């Protein structure tokens, strides 16, 4: 027995050395991890705020190729570039790559959101969200959404000579989310939540240093207060559902509360509801407001595109009597307008990039991606690739006339694979109805140049001020 034990004790170190040598024989990607914790985080954030992040990554690609190592937001990271890399990231098994975000995003939004869940938990929560966000359910929301948009235009656009678009679109999209998804009516509760939410967003992409007066600390504090508000709202919705006969379809939170398992227990935990409500707020508020804002900018700069959108929307408006709401069929006719939205997303994607995490050592492109490292991809790098989209700086909605002609995994405005954004249809409806009323009721001219920065979302110069004139009804 002692001989066997001694032999094993001698063999184990040899075995470990062989494993280490085998792993070290695989090359890490070229590049540098930079300074501890900080790495290249500040450099990338500066480039995003100066609207040079694409050039920042292009320099890396020219220097190191499509695979390189760096350190972002406190973690060693591998940057991957190209449609093949996108496909690898989007379609790899969750046992190989998981959808873990950087620490700052994880801590602000919570660890039970779709951004963090994997496997059966991800499927369960995503399916629950899709019960409300699928087209069949959203058809019943068109009128309610349209009411919010009409009210917004009456309050903030009519009678004005100049407006600043981005803050107004943020107000509009937050009100739509509050009403349709959370059932929060206009008033002090909505106003308090939007203030917390905006403060929360400020530190989501930041170095996770939890010190006083940092953006990250303020973001964490706002997230905690917002989560407490949402827990109170969930309790009220639970009472309405169980004791007052509220409809399960009246808003997203009530819908989630109504989903039961075989033991008649809530399918989604309260923590999952809170974290995913924060995620929906983030995804639905900032991304949609940015998309609509930059659509108006491109329509200002592209007269031929504007005329095509105007004609499409006026043709629909002429079929309506005064006060009539749009229908699902009307939205299905707005094909060119949606192509304009897709081209806007291609040229200025609201989400610059995202992260995954390697759950085991991965060999890709001849290099080792070590277990535990982040994997980073950036959507503009394929969106603006001349080999994929000829004349990529030209605004051309007809690129999306035939979806089959778009190379797989090259347009990633909504992500891809099983983790594609579940709110695509909601974003489409919100965008189309808003653009319909803007182009049929107003004309506008830009008051500032067309530059923008990222912080981390794209922000146009001065928030995109417009000089507007109200049109006569058709």
Give the location of each predicted region:
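Cytochrome P450 heme-thiolate monooxygenase catalytic core
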Residues: 98-106, 117, 121, 137-290, ...
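Conserved, non-catalytic sequence blocks in retroelement Pol enzymes and Pol-derived host proteins
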Residues: 27-30, 134-140, 242-246, 328-335, ...
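N-terminal membrane-proximal hinge/A-helix region immediately C-terminal to the signal-anchor transmembrane segment
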Residues: 2-124, 139, 143-154, 353, ...
């Amino acid at each position: 027995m002692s001989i066997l034990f001694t032999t094993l004790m001698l063999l184990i170190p040899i075995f470990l050395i062989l494993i280490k040598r085998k792993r070290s024989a695989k090359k890490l990607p070229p590049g540098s991890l930079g300074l501890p914790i900080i790495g290249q985080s500040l450099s990338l954030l500066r480039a995003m705020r100066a609207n040079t992040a694409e050039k920042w990554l292009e320099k890396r690609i020219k220097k190191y190729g499509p695979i390189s190592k760096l350190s972002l937001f406190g973690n060693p990271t591998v940057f991957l570039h190209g449609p093949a890399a996108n496909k690898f990231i989007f379609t790899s098994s969750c046992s190989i790559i998981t959808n873990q975000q950087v620490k700052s995003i994880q801590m602000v939004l919570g660890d039970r959101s779709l951004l963090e869940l994997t496997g059966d938990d991800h499927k369960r929560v995503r399916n629950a969200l899709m019960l409300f966000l699928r087209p069949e359910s959203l058809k019943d929301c068109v009128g309610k959404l349209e009411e919010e948009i009409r009210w917004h235009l009456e309050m903030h656009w009519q009678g004005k000579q100049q407006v600043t678009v981005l803050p107004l679109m943020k107000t509009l999209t937050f009100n739509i989310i509050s009403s349709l998804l959370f059932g929060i009516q206009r008033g002090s509760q909505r106003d308090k939540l939007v203030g917390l939410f905006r403060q929360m967003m400020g530190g989501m992409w930041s170095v996770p240093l939890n010190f006083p007066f940092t953006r990250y600390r303020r973001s964490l504090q706002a997230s905690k207060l917002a989560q407490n508000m949402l827990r109170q709202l969930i309790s009220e919705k639970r009472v309405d559902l169980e004791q007052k006969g509220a409809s399960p379809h009246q808003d997203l939170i009530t819908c989630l509360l109504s989903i039961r398992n075989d033991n008649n227990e809530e399918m989604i935990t309260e923590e999952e509801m809170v974290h995913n409500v924060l995620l929906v707020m983030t995804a639905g508020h900032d991304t949609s407001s940015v998309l609509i804002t930059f659509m108006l900018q491109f329509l200002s700069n592209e007269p031929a595109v504007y005329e095509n959108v105007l004609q499409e929307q006026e043709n629909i408006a002429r079929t309506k009597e005064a006060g009539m709401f749009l229908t699902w069929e009307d939205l299905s006719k707005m094909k060119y307008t949606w192509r304009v939205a897709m081209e806007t997303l291609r040229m200025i994607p609201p989400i610059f990039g995202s992260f995954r995490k390697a759950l085991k050592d991965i060999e890709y492109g001849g290099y080792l991606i070590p277990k535990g490292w982040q994997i980073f991809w950036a959507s503009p790098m394929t969106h603006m690739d001349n080999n994929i989209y000829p004349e990529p700086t030209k605004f051309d909605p007809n690129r999306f006339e035939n979806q089959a002609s778009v190379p797989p995994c090259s347009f990633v405005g909504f992500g891809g694979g099983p983790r594609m954004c579940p709110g695509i249809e909601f974003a489409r409806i919100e965008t189309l109805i808003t653009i319909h009323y803007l182009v049929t009721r107003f004309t506008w001219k830009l008051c500032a140049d067309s530059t923008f920065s990222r912080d981390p979302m794209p922000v146009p110069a001065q928030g995109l001020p417009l000089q507007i004139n109200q049109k006569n009804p058709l």
